[in-house]
Amino acid sequence: MDKITGPFRKSKKSFRKPLPPIQSGDRIDYQNIDVLRRFISQQGKILSRRVNRLTLKQQRLLNLAIKQARILSFLPFTNTESLEKMKARIREARLKAEEVRLKNKEARLKKAKDARLKAKEARNQKKTTLRKIFINPKTSKLNTETSQT
C-alpha cells in the first residue's frame, strides 16, 4: 500500500490533554465542600463526566460524595446562591420599611402623649367648681357644697 500524500493526509499534530480538575492532593470526600462545589451546576445539578473531564472512577466517587454531602446537609439540594442574594435584598428592604414604620409610630405616640399632657395641664389650670350633693341624716334635708379643685 502506498502512503497517501497530498492535501488529504492527516496531520500528526501533537495535542496536550488539559489537566484534570482534580489534582493529586485533592480528595473526593463528602466533607471537602470546596472541591464538590466545582462540579455542581448553577441549578444545583451534578455536572456530567464529559463536562468535568473526570475518569469514570472519579465521577462515581464524586457522585457518591455529593449525594452524601447533600444528605448530611453540607451541600444544598438546589443551588440557591442567587436566591439567597435576592432574599437578603428583600430582608433588607423589609427591615428598612419596618424601621420607618416604627419611627412613624413613635412620632405618633409622642404627639398623642404631648396632646394628652397639654389637655391635662389645661384642666388643672382651669378652676372648676364641684358641687357635692348629699342628704344630711340628722335633718333629712338636701345640702350642697361647692369646692374648688
UniProtKB/Swiss-Prot annotation:
The record's subcellular locations are: Plastid
Taxonomy, superkingdom: Eukaryota
Q: What is its main location?
A: plastid
Entry-linked Pfam families:
Ribosomal_S18
Q: Which UniProt keywords apply?
A: Plastid, Ribonucleoprotein, Ribosomal protein, RNA-binding, rRNA-binding
Region Disordered, residue ranges: 1-23
Which Gene Ontology terms cover its molecular function?
A: small ribosomal subunit rRNA binding; structural constituent of ribosome
User: Assembly and interactions?
Assistant: Part of the 30S ribosomal subunit.
Q: Which family does it belong to?
A: Belongs to the bacterial ribosomal protein bS18 family.
Q: What is this protein called?
A: Small ribosomal subunit protein bS18c
The opening ranks of the lineage are: Eukaryota, Viridiplantae, Streptophyta, Embryophyta, Tracheophyta
Gene encoding it? rps18
